[in-house]
């Protein structure tokens, strides 16, 4: 039997993981000499472990999965510099008012928004309201908006900055690695992607959202949530499947591995506490 420590492992050396995680560190634009430490690096590591396990179970080759896990480790790079307090204020305010947080959802409501200009449209619509709420919409605050509604361009900027460092690490960066990182916010960008790229992108969305919905810290800071439940996690994934973002094979494999206990230790770490007996029974029945 596979031991807990060997389940859903990191496939790249710890030394490389440490180097990659350092790419999330960001110089504070308002306080010279201060570095904003990458937010929730452990979320990225847990997500990457889950992604590699699902990709392997779906038959992707070892070298591709290793390269994929590197992309998954960096999937939040477009949010390097996330200011927990400011980001939380802006997006909790938006959530209370049911304001879309993904570009596709924004354009569905605001159909006159030019593609790629969702951040600017958000600011035009809500700047005065946010400032009346006590949130000054400085250039730094605008970046916190861009981390969601302009994720593609912010990720591209950050990748341009760190690409030389990635190369020095001996990592070969392929275009598909950036593509899979964008799928949750920009599914349309993978409309003509190869099936295997699309599947890896789906896996990242499924695992990242599953971990995020189990993540106590992220729930408090990012989703304005006070409690983590497995029911909520899979309910959201099922919504994404109904929307065509996730496919049956990806969801089925995630359920099977979850039922087999592949992710128990990862999810308990994310929650900050052990599962109850009832929760563990629910996990074991996840495939049925």
Region locations from a protein language model:
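Histidine- and acidic-residue-rich, metal-dependent catalytic cores
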Residues: 4-288
């Amino acid at each position: 039997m596979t031991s807990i420590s060997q389940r859903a492992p990191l496939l790249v050396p710890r030394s490389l993981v440490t180097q990659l995680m350092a790419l999330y560190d960001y110089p504070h634009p308002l306080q010279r000499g201060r570095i904003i430490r990458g937010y929730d690096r452990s979320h990225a590591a847990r997500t990457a472990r889950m992604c590699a396990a699902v990709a392997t179970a779906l038959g992707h080759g070892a070298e591709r999965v290793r390269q994929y896990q590197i992309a998954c480790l960096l999937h939040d790079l477009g949010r390097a510099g996330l200011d927990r307090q400011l980001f939380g204020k802006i997006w909790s305010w938006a959530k209370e008012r049911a304001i879309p947080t993904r570009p596709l959802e924004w354009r569905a409501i605001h159909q006159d928004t030019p593609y790629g200009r969702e951040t600017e449209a958000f600011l035009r619509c809500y700047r005065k309201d946010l400032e009346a709420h006590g949130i000054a919409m400085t250039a730094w605050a605008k970046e916190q908006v861009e981390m969601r509604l302009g994720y593609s361009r912010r990720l591209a900027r950050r990748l341009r900055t760190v690409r030389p460092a990635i190369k020095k690490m001996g990592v070969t960066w392929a275009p598909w690695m950036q593509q899979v990182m964008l799928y949750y916010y920009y599914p349309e960008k993978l409309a003509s992607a190869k099936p295997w790229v699309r599947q890896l992108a789906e896996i990242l969305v499924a695992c990242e959202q599953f971990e995020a919905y189990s993540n106590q810290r992220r729930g408090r800071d990012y989703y304005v949530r006070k409690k983590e439940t497995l029911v909520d996690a899979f309910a959201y994934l099922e919504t994404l499947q109904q929307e065509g973002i996730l496919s049956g094979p990806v969801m089925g494999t995630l359920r099977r591995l979850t039922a087999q206990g592949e992710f128990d230790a990862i999810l308990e770490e994310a929650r900050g506490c052990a599962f109850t007996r009832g929760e563990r029974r629910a996990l074991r029945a996840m495939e049925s």
